[in-house]
Structure formats: structure tokens, C-alpha cells
Amino acid sequence: MPLYDYGNTRLRARISKLFSFPTLESFAYLTSLDSLISQLSKTHYQDAIQIALTYAHGYGCISDALRRKLIEIQDNLRRFYDPVIWEKIKTIFLREDVKNIKSIIRGIIHKTQPRIIINSLSPLGVIPEQYTTRIAQAKNIQDAIDRMSVYQLEFAPSLLALKGSDRFASSAELERVLEFWYFSKIEQILKGSGENIDLLRKANMIEIDITNINTLLRYVDAPDSPETAGSTIEHFLIEGGSYSPKYLINLSHTNLISDVIKKLAGKKYQSYLMEALNCYQETQLLSEFENQLRIYALRWLSLLPKLSPFGVGVPMGYVALKKSEIRNIRWIAKGILSGFEPKFIIENIERIQ
């Protein structure tokens, strides 16, 4: 696939420079953030660290450098690939936009300080950062959606259509509209056939599954939640995943999370859901399931550069691997800052290969 040759060659070189797990584990034994900064400055993080050091130190320096490396991911892919190819690859980053807007909506509804909302946003989205910053500073949801409309964001009309309805101020309903817009948009982009389209569709199916499973678990855990009151689960389910909406609707009548997981676990996510269930039984946090499903998706993506070395699998895998590396460095930095034992830091390093 000639259109992918140049970009894939460049990305394979970058994949070869990613930190091995023994290297990440060695960082956990460092006794200070200054030592970690020193070590990172001798690696492919050198430029980002040097820039960050001009106006930050300690964790602030590391956080700024990691943010720069995240932004660099999309910048590189734009440069390395033909615009036609980029339109397909861009679907990876559109998901980040949806997550960012959902975070903004939740933050505004719960009256979170704009600074905190802005700091939680991923720089990997396609929407310009100055737009998301301005939206996060809105005084209320109405103002936020008006700003989305002014910036001509594609999903703004769908959100504006809710104005005047009883569900307008509902985070769950606004997020539902965003999810439906996103998956409809991806379906339009991924029309056609071929190996590359098939890979992107499989990735999209995993996202649908994760969205639907999380929706199902929230319903079972809190069927009378104010966020979902007055709506059936069918209202929130996305078509096109591994599980039919009918099957998920039937499961929503199950009383216990553990029973739902055991019925879901016969599919490809079995070991991940069961691992999450073990953790959930200790913590009672539904985020255990979301995290394990995210790990499944990252591991699937991380294999693509080897399984599909001549097409879109390389950029898909590279993005997953780089995001995971950055997440691990951030965790190690926080662990050192908090004074955690090296063993504990190492045990919680994300391993997707």
C-alpha cells in the first residue's frame, strides 16, 4: 500500500524507540522527580523536557513534557500521511473530541471550576485547544452549546435540538446525543471495503461494545438514577456492536452486576471482564470494568503494526502504544511524588504488550 509506506516507515522507527517494560520499571526505583527528569532528558523525550524546563520544574515539568509528546502524535501523523489517508486515521482522534466534550458537559453541570475541567482535557482531539478551553469556561450548558455552535462544531446542531426539552440539562442525555452523532459520523467515514476499512470498523465495534457495556452496568447498578430516570436503556444503546441491543436490554433486568458479567463473559472480553469483576467486588467501582475494557482495546491495537504492517494498522497501533507509554510515565512520576514503594508503582504499570 504505497500511500502508507512513508508514514509507516517513520512510525515503525518510533515504535522501536518506545520504552521497554524493564526500562519503565527502572524509573520506578528513582528517588526523586529530578532524577526522573534527568533520565527522560537522555531519551526521545529530550526536546520536550528541555522546553518544559525553561518555565517549570518537578511534576509540572514532566506533565508539560508529556502533554507536548501527546500533541506531537497527531502532528506527526498529519505530516507523514497523505490527506486522504489522514481522513481515515483521524477517526482515532475524533473519539478524543467526544470524550473532551463529555468531560466539559459533566464539569459544567456539576459546577466544576473551569481550570480543573481544562486540565482534564486530552490534547489529542481534532478540535482546536482554544475552542475547548473557551467552551469549558462557559457559565452554563446553554452558553457552552452556543459556543460550540459559534465554532461550527459538527455535533452542535444535534445538541441544540435538545433546547427546550426536559432532558436539556441532563448530562446523560447530552452525552447520548454526542455518542450517537459520533458513531453515525464514523459510519459515514468508513464506507467502502478493504483491509484498512475493516480494521477501522473492528476498532469502532470495540468502542461501541465498551460504550454499551458501560451503559448496561450503570443501569443495573443504579436503575433509578436521576440521570436516566424516564428513559429506558434502549434509548442509550448503540447499534453495531458485538452484542445486540435486545440481548443487552434483557440483561438490564438482572439484579446483580456479577450475574451480568458472567453472562457477558462468554464473548471475546471474558478474561478482562472477570478480572474487572474481581476488582469490583473489592472496590465497588464500576470504573474497574471501563479500565479493563480500555486495556483490551489498547492490547488489540498494539498488535496491529505486526499483524497489518502495510496499512492503517501501523498508525493505529503506534497511537495506542505511545499513549500507554505516556500514561505509564505520568503514573511513575505521580508514584515517586507520592512516595509510593517501587514495587507498588511497578505493579500498577499498564502492560499492553
Task: Give each language-model segment a name.
Residues 1-353:
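N-terminal domain-start signal
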